[in-house]
């Protein structure tokens, strides 16, 4: 949803409330994530204020409906959040490990000019890997993913294991 469009916000808020109320007693829900990858967060000050206000309002509204943590924007451009989440699809395990190093007391973020500063929240990589691969094909129009696709199942598992080990 384009959070800078008042009609989108007007439609999203009641639908989001109904989702939280409907599912708040479900035992498998450990956190609420109203937004994913808010790439449309503008650099323009006025539009950025609208975006941030929408995120802040939905965060507060979610907390008013349930006690669980709220991950405001999964992956990037956090405004107010109980969980610090990032998405990283680096395909080289060594580069991923280097990216994850805490520098100056900060976990990595996608864009320091757009993200609020990290404030000690639990840190999650909630998306990674995304390995491009179609069994038996080096490249295919139907394949989707990141990096050069592996040539064998063994190469796929080796890359996945390397990326996972870099995180752990």
What is each residue range found by the language model?
Residues 1-168:
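Substrate-binding/catalytic cleft of secreted carbohydrate-active enzymes
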